Amino acid sequence: MTRPRPPLGPAMAGAVDLSGIKQRAQQNAAASTDADRALSTPSGVTEITEANFEDEVIVRSDEVPVVVLLWSPRSEVCVDLLDTLSGLAAAAKGKWSLASVNVDVAPRVAQIFGVQAVPTVVALAAGQPISSFQGLQPADQLSRWVDSLLSATAGKLKGAASSEESTEVDPAVAQARQQLEDGDFVAARKSYQAILDANPGSVEAKAAIRQIEFLIRATAQRPDAVSVADSLSDDIDAAFAAADVQVLNQDVSAAFERLIALVRRTSGEERTRVRTRLIELFELFDPADPEVVAGRRNLANALY
């Protein structure tokens, strides 16, 4: 999920027009042999040039999410980010593809993305950007970001060819999805927990449980939670309830600012408690969401 509205919406939609490139790539792909396809998609990091951009980014993103890192070896931050993403890609074993664009070597590819600074990371699915961020991110946050990409695109792409994975949706997963869609949060939580118990690496189950737990809590809050919290400015529980309702109503920035203001007014265990809840709310969203980025920055300012 990330929001009660669709998660990982096209954060860069309209910023990069890849439709023409995608059309040409599909035409080229139709003329390629299976052997050529295998040779052009090695495991690990794929170095992108003008020559392979269409195949390895646009066409490949019809199969699995493609994370494009635009970087320069002259920057230590870029090198660190490449190392972290490379490790995540290796661990994913083909569930997503990491494409590396050295902007010093392939400046015209960088221009396609309108890069203003490096490192810049853009995730694509079905030939279109779906999320992006600039700068170095903590490893745990990058891992959650990748998880959110996989969750948001689950069942929507062709998938990489694999003898280990079936194209059919697991009946247990289908049931859990339907329960969540029907608003039966308790049943969906139980179903997803069973999936996670059987498969501890399930990206979808982890994300769904986190989201469902929020929805169960938020929908149980009193309707006037915001006005109550406004009248009790230092009541932590009231602030938590109000923030839940605000997030549920998609007034996300206001929810974040409410708790950040409380961080500024508290100390010790109380401050830790508020900070922990705020981070939990951040984790409901795409880490590259502008409201999350601003919220994390404001929280850091409030703490330090």
Swiss-Prot record:
MF GO annotations: oxidoreductase activity
Secretion signal span: 1-15
Keywords: Signal
Keyword presence, Glycosyltransferase: no
Domain of life assignment: Bacteria
Protein name in the entry: Uncharacterized protein Rv1324
Signal keyword on record: yes
Provenance organism: Mycobacterium tuberculosis (strain ATCC 25618 / H37Rv)
PROSITE patterns noted in UniProt: THIOREDOXIN_2
CC terms in the record's Gene Ontology section: peptidoglycan-based cell wall; plasma membrane
All residue ranges annotated as the Thioredoxin domain in the record: 28-151
InterPro entries assigned to the protein according to its UniProt record, in alphabetical order: Thioredoxin-like_sf, Thioredoxin_domain, TPR-like_helical_dom_sf
Pfam families: Thioredoxin (PF00085), TPR_20 (PF14561)
Any one GO biological process: cell redox homeostasis
